[in-house]
Regions:
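Catalytic alpha/beta active-site cores
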Residues: 1-269, 273
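Extended amphipathic alpha-helical segments enriched in small hydrophobics
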Residues: 273-285
Length: 285
């Protein structure tokens, strides 16, 4: 990274930390510094009222560029465009398609379809649901289906049928048997069967470089009352468990890792939420 210059600040006298502290104490007029100005976070550390350059000495990752380890600024190197996504529950295929087309006209470029968990969707069903929705332009995500393998096969076959350019297809299936075990106390089918499904999903997704098939849903932990640290710990542990179990089944880490998608809960505590996403990128890297 280029070294920062101070050309704009040459006329301003540097202010020592001790001078800041002296001024703060004066303005407090005897009030307790710790109680008034120090934020005691639920994550177990105290946030000071201000920070200075010396506080970030040694934090080399702050100088990293997007696309470089440890990826705290993401992996995109040409732009930083984010998908704008809207979720919708699919009760009726035609009505869901109409709603999807309507919101796409309003600027949405990512769709999250929450499917009937018990229904096995055919290629014809997906044709109705995704009519006039172009997978090379719109990110298409499926949530909730217990028949993830059949869904993936049918979606992939439809992409082939319509000659979609696989390198431009973005989306996800979000199959999460560990999440199912955590929230429901049981697997979709069985431990062995669900992990075998994960493996087969990854094998199909090998043709779709921007389509992820395994979802780690940190929102489950967030909504159960986990702190930021706990949500990160539980989510990353689930990710590591998928890596461990699936590499034991013959897949390489390079097969598995790119196919895992993490979702985290976001609250009104924005600074901590931003820190959580950056920390997740760093720890997973």
């Amino acid at each position: 990274m280029d070294k920062p210059t101070n050309n704009l600040f040459e006329e301003f006298r540097p202010v020592a930390t001790s001078e800041y502290e002296e001024k703060i104490l004066k303005d407090l007029k005897g009030a307790d510094y710790e109680k008034r100005l120090v934020w005691r976070t639920g994550e177990g550390f105290n946030a000071r009222p201000y920070y200075r350059r010396e506080d970030i000495d040694g934090m080399d990752h702050l100088d990293s560029f997007p696309g470089n380890f440890p990826y705290v600024r993401g992996k995109k190197i040409h732009d930083n465009n984010w998908f704008v996504r809207q979720e919708m529950k699919v009760d009726d295929l035609e009505k869901a398609n109409e709603k999807a087309l309507d919101i796409l006209m309003k600027g949405i470029d990512s769709l999250g379809f929450t499917l009937d968990p018990e229904k096995e969707y055919t290629r014809e069903d997906l044709d109705v649901l995704l009519k006039n929705i172009f997978a090379e332009i719109v990110e298409i995500n499926f949530n909730g289906s217990t028949h993830a393998l059949a869904l993936m096969k049918n979606h992939y076959e439809n992409l082939q049928h319509y000659n979609r350019e696989f390198s431009k297809v973005h989306g996800s299936i979000n199959y999460d048997p560990l999440g199912r075990l955590i929230t429901k106390g049981q697997w979709f089918e069985s431990e062995t069967g669900d992990l075998e499904t994960c493996k087969k999903l990854i094998e199909i997704a090998a043709h779709l470089p921007h389509f992820k098939v395994i979802g780690v849903n940190g929102v489950n932990f967030h909504e159960a009352g986990s702190s930021t640290v706990e949500e990160l710990a539980f989510s990353l542990s689930a990710g590591v468990e998928y890596l461990t179990r699936l590499t034991e089944m013959g897949l390489s880490i390079n097969d598995v890792a790119p196919n895992i998608k993490f979702s985290f809960g976001i609250s009104s505590n924005y600074f901590m939420a931003i820190a959580k996403i950056r920390a997740a990128r760093w720890l997973w890297a």
